[in-house]
Amino acid sequence: MSDNWVVQNLENALETWNEKLAEIWQLITTTPQDFKGGGIWGVIVNINGAVQSIGLALLVLFFVAGMVKTCGSFTEVKKPEHALKLFVRFAIAKGAITYGMELMLALFNIVQGTISTIMGSAGFSTPQQTVLPPELITSVEECGFFESIPLWAVTLIGGLFITVMSFILIMTVYGRFFKLYMYTALAPIPLSTFAGEPSQNVGKSFIKSYCAVCLEGAVIVLSCIIFSLFASSPPVVNPDAVAVTQVWSYIGELLFNMLVLVGSVKMSDRIIREMMGL
C-alpha cells in the first residue's frame, strides 16, 4: 500500500467495497440452514412448528367457511363429487401446512440451482476486485503539499460515498435473508387458506411472494456480474490532466457504476415482482 494519505484513503474505501461485494457473493450461495452457523434456522424451525398448530386451527375455519360459501345447502355436500372435491382440498391444505417447510426449501433449492447456473455460465467464481489505476497513484504521489489539499476534500467525499454504498449493498442482501426467515416461520398461517376456495388466493399470493424473494438472489448475482465486467475495465484516466482532475474524474465514473449496482440490488424485489406480475 502507498504511503500517501490520499491514496491510502481511496484504497481503504475500495477495500471495504471489495470485502462487502465478496461477502454478498458468499451470502447469495449460502442456504438458510447454514447462515451464521445454523443457529437462526434452528429457532425458525421451532417457531414454524409452534405456528403449525395455529395453522391447523385456521385450516378448519377456512374449510368450513369455504364449504358454506361454495355449497348452497347440506344436500350438495352429500353429493359424491362435492364431497370428493372438499376432501381433496382439505387434504392438500393439510399437507401444505405439515410439509410447508419442505416445499419452501425445495423452491429455494431450485432458485439456488438457477443462481449456480448463472454463475457458471458467466464464468465467475468471485466478483472482480476494484483497484486504483497505477497511473492515478503515480500522479497523486507526485503532488506537493498545497496541490494535495483539494485532493483531500475530493478523496474524503469519494471515500465516504463508497463506504456508505458498501453498507447499503450488504444490508439489502441481509434483508433478503431476514425475509426468507420470516416467510418460513409464518408459513403455516397463509398456507392454511388453501382449505377454502374463497380464501385460496391468499395462499397463492404467499407462494408467489416467497418465490419472488428467492429469485431476488438471481437479480443480485446478475447485477454483481454486470458490475464486475464494468470493474474489469476501470475508468480511463487522462495522465496529462492535473491530479485533482484525474481523481475527480475517476471517482465520479466509479461512483456512477457503483450507484447503478446499488440501485439494481435495491430494486431486485421490484424487478422480480414486475416479472411475475405481483
Where are these regions (language model features)?
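Hydrophobic alpha-helical transmembrane segments
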Residues: 53-65, 157, 161-163, 180
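Alpha-helical transmembrane segments and their helix-start/interface "positive-inside/aromatic belt" motifs
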Residues: 2-10, 80-100, 203-213
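Non-cytosolic segments of integral membrane proteins
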Residues: 94-186, 224-277
